[in-house]
Amino acid sequence: MEKIIVIGGGAGGLELVTRLSRSLGKRQKAQLILVDKSRTHVWKPLLHEVAAGVIDKQSDGVEYGIHATRHGYEFQLGNVNRVDSDNKSIHLDPLLDDDGSEILPARSLSYDKLVIAAGSMSNDFGTPGVAQHSYFLDSLNQAERFHRALLNQLLKKDHEKSFEQKLRIAIVGGGATGTELAAQLHYIGDLAKSYGMPNMSANRLSITIIEAGPRILPALPERITNAAKSALFKINIEVKENTRVSEATAEGFVTDKGDVIQADLMVWAAGVKAPQFVKDIKHVEHNRLGQIIVNEYLQTPNSNDFYVIGDSCGVERPDGSWVPPRAQSAHQMAATVATNLINEAKGKTLKPFKYVDYGSLVHFSKYSTVGSLMGKLSNNNMFVEGRLAKLVYVSLYTFHLLAVHGKLKGLLTLMSRKVSSLLGPKFKLH
């Protein structure tokens, strides 16, 4: 039986293995293995909400082990450190507990076909002090770590007698993650008052977004940037554009002009790069972001048994640009590779990948949602905001749940999430 390994259980990887399990795994036509360093999947566009504490993995997470049992594939917990394409094997680090004790030794897994869906991470560009003093939001563990630090700072500020000193939060990166996190944190400032912190309010927060480029949300149309800046301005979030960070210290971020942006909590949400093991894979070509360059079928040019999807996948478009690292890209790639792996098993022709940009949306907590619709959703680049934008934003997550759980369980999960939001706490205190 052919063994297919998928590395990474993010938006693309989990959807892919779910699709394959229906056609190959449950029918005993292939052995499917998903490898991820986390036990729980949370849709990456929601990680900033985990960090702020408005959702948690209990209600919005998918336990890989349980999902694997229900869908007929195998889950392996571990961090991949090397892919040996010559010998068609992957190598995992020893699995350690929180105290550093070994649970499982280093392992290696052989494959017949490999799909890398490992996602991406923020790029600190080697800026001194960033790794030591900043929080990142690339994984569930990192988001939960920031949330614990946020709770501690809110409690500390709530017990201070002087209201003049604010809780200072600085976020480097004016993309979707940075701007959405800023708005969500402002909302939390007011929400904390109802959850045992009577002296807290949004007025006691000082939130700054630091963007190196000339405008925030640089990948989106300028009209969206202007609407986003207006929404952030209304809730007193400071936006510093054309501001490069040269160093991070215990006091805050230092700009290339020598100014210090003081902060009690520092977040780095800038840049994109592929995981190191992806960059180290031999016999493949990488672009400047470390992504693996693939052919029209999302295979590496020198191997029909090696596919790449999601943020680690480099697909060059006719105009010379690259398919952007977004959830919608991963979703479309997962569908294409699932079709191709199933077609290969049946001896049928492969399907070339065609990226369709449906637009982008940015959700600023309860305050505003702005974006643009393209592709099949609109004949032109249509600007949307307000309720329509929020409806489309929510529908993106709905599509993901349906792809991961199927129609019935996906809809039940949505209903459960709605009931939980109505009856449960709006702010996570642990």
Give the label of every model feature segment:
Residues 29, 71, 75-94, 186-296, ...:
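A Rossmann-like FAD-binding core segment of flavoenzymes
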Residues 7-8, 116, 172:
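Conserved N-terminal Rossmann-fold NAD(P)-binding element of oxidoreductases
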Residues 333, 338-430:
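C-terminal, flexible cofactor-proximal segment of oxidoreductases
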Residues 1-82, 179-219, 267:
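Beta1-alpha1 glycine-rich phosphate/pyrophosphate-binding loop at the start
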Residues 146-202:
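Rossmann-like NAD(P)H-binding beta-loop-alpha module
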Residues 132-160, 251-253, 260-332:
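FAD-site-proximal beta/loop scaffold in flavoenzymes
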